[in-house]
Amino acid sequence: MVYTLNGSRDVYVGESVNLAARMRQHLAAPEKQHLDDVRVILDETFNKSVCLDLESQLIRLLAGDGKYRVLNRNDGITDSDYFDRANYRDKFDEIFEELRAANVFERPVAEIMNSDLFKLSPFKALTPDQAIAMEDILEGLFLDLETDQPSTILVQGDPGTGKTIVAIYLTKLLRDIATIPAPEDLSGDSMFAEFFAEGHRELLEDLRIALVVPQQSLRASIRQVFARTPGLSADMVLSPFQVGESTDPFDILIVDETHRLNQRANQASGVLNAKFTEINLQLFGSDDTSWTQLDWIIAQSRHQLFLLDSAQRVRPADLPTETLNGLVRSTKAKGRVYPLWSQMRVRGGADYVDYVRRILSPEPAVDISYQEFPGYEFRLYDNLLDMCQQLREKDAADGLARLVAGFAWPWRSKKNSKEYDIELDGCHLQWNRTAVDWINSRGAIDEVGSIHTVQGYDLNYAGVIIGPDLRYDPLQRKLIFDRANYHDTKGKENNPRLGIKYDDDDLLRLVSNIYGVLLTRGARGTFVYVCDPDLRNHLRQFIPV
């Protein structure tokens, strides 16, 4: 049987064959004594596998709903296939609706699954490669802690392989291991139960652990999730500057989106430029321009775990490719690199991610064959108005359908809210009005997001406008970067501190990366509109019209 146990603020979900004994255990646990409302789900057709599946689904949905704080530990949610699972899942939908009618849930399933609380929740069923990586990471980390050896760990994966989920999941798991009062309810069915055994808690309980997220918007979203998750707190989610400024070192730093850490470059404000200098002086005794935010992370922690996709560098200030390659080489030499392969976001699978990266590669496309992706809506539009209308219909039906674009138009509406930024084919559009959590903001369906508001996030459908910053030369048969039509000032800024001038080929690689990120946001589909006629004609051979 499966049960929920809740009070006014908290909820716990469990599975047991002996409910009475299980309730006695809960009543004896101080952290659950305030839970006084019990609901038991009984079905004579439910076997052990079905009960574990229902338990894990309820945990995930309750975490995403946000009405209650979920008290379950993150010791490995089950997601195993079993006989007749599809039919049992239909019964789960009925159970959910009954629980919602009883006010256990506030929102419908579709709304929950579109929320950041759900998408960024640590309560996730891991893919096999994520689970293998997690187990290997934990085994190695605990060995390092036992022997008092510093360590560097690296997780690599393409867009949609769940790097951010691994970062969040691991942070929660380490905190749970460190704070678990007693292993009274750990089960052999739990994926990571062995790490809650005696000895591991003692290695972690006094350690300072934090999650580092370079992007402002994603960092704010994760902070909201951490604030509502027992064992975690918003102040555990830091910017690289907060790490550098800390007067106390960290024991473990988990760094998401490592490719967005900065080298020494002109920052967004004079205040941040001054901070860069101050941090270098504090940590290294000099303001050598070769120091990067990667160096800050290493200097400020004994153990580091980096999550990386080098093809998602999008600005000149991001760590250079050679620095990232050096990190990969040194970590691989120690046997501490873990790849993620399974595509969790895009229904087109890993082949789709590879395909869109190749058709927009700065290298001439000479060996690419047309591919279709059954079950995934991938379409090229000749008219932006038509694409916008289709996207609105998808948003009305499924939610989370958004327009995104390269930074090929100036942000006029930032100073004058009545001005339009993008005017094409009868469409009059403005850039995103908020830089934080734009995807879920009111009116987002009427706006256009940039790389800085969507990198790291999932959409159901993405309508991608490839602007005039990217063109195609049919004579040379290659992509061309149009500097005059690229309006991200920081995206094309030279680096006089390091004596670097970025030519058009350098920026073409970054702009190609940007569109590669935008084209891999949509879980169910991606619609494409291309401004440059030659590039549009070129892409017709690769994208269905």
What are these regions (language model features)?
Residues 163:
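Conserved lysine of the Walker
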